[in-house]
């Protein structure tokens, strides 16, 4: 297996007062975030909290309702060509062979580069096969190769391992971590798997009520040994916070409960 060469260093990111609304529904609310170049950040939170929305804003697929997205002193949109997004589904074109899926949209002499990135993810020998012949994990490796061929400085991962079996998922986690260590691009990983977030990231963010509710540095040496006491303690800390209702939601629940109790008391007095 060869390594991909000449990937530039990661993209630094600054989000200033980012808001995102869909009609009357606010998904992100005055979100503030700074990510240094080359950092590996995992984003967790309940379903519908805005994790994937954040990635779409960073990828330039949607525009923020409020605020500014920056890379250094320039708008992040200027780095769009150096940004790649991977989804839970590999999204390979079934009528194109593996190597052609990797080089999708490229012009000129790209086939040698495509073979190189396929070798990087361990699939050079499958270059001329059809996607239907690949397993789910292999399809995601092809999707990763398709991202790598563009020499990304920012890699956005939206639950790319969520549909894989446990063993394949661990293998893919190791591959992503090795490539990140070798090439230094910035990574944002959205995941529902807290153990995955702790195993891979330098930093874990929890989004709740449209804002960063927790920003936890994962100061553990790599490679991280699964089952270690420190890893388990961090997993428990993040999981407890994810499962705890945000203060605003809890206050709303208490208000509703008090209102109902007050109404019930009034009825008893009236009777």
From Swiss-Prot:
Gene3D superfamilies listed in its UniProt record: P-loop containing nucleotide triphosphate hydrolases
Keyword Hydrolase (UniProt): no
Keyword match Chaperone: no
Pfam families named in the record: ABC_tran
Catalytic activity: ATP + H2O + aliphatic sulfonate-[sulfonate-binding protein]Side 1 = ADP + phosphate + aliphatic sulfonateSide 2 + [sulfonate-binding protein]Side 1
EC numbers: 7.6.2.14
Protein name per UniProt: Aliphatic sulfonates import ATP-binding protein SsuB
Primary gene name: ssuB
């Amino acid at each position: 297996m060869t390594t991909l060469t000449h990937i530039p260093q990661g993209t630094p990111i600054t989000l200033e007062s980012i808001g995102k609304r869909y009609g009357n529904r606010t998904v992100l609310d005055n979100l503030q975030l700074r990510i240094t170049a080359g950092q590996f950040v995992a984003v967790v939170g309940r379903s519908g909290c805005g994790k994937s929305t954040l990635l779409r804003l960073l990828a330039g697929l949607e525009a923020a309702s409020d605020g500014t997205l920056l890379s250094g002193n320039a708008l992040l949109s200027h780095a769009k060509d150096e940004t790649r997004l991977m989804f839970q589904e590999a999204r390979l074109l079934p009528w194109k062979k593996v190597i052609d899926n990797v080089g999708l949209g490229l012009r000129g002499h790209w086939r040698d580069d495509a073979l190189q990135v396929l070798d990087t993810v361990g699939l050079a020998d499958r270059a001329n096969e059809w996607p239907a012949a690949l397993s789910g994990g292999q399809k995601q490796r092809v999707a990763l190769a398709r991202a790598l061929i563009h020499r990304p400085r920012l890699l956005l991962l939206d639950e790319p391992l969520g549909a894989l079996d446990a063993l394949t998922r661990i293998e893919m986690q190791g591959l992503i971590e090795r490539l990140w260590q070798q090439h230094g691009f910035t990574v944002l990983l959205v995941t529902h798997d807290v153990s995955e977030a702790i195993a891979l990231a330098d930093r874990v963010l929890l989004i709740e009520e449209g804002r960063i509710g927790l920003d936890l540095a994962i100061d553990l040496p790599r490679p991280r040994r699964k089952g270690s006491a420190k890893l388990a303690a961090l997993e428990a800390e993040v999981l407890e916070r994810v499962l705890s209702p945000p203060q605003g939601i809890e206050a709303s629940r208490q208000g509703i409960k008090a209102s109902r109790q007050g109404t019930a008391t009034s009825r008893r007095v009236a009777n």
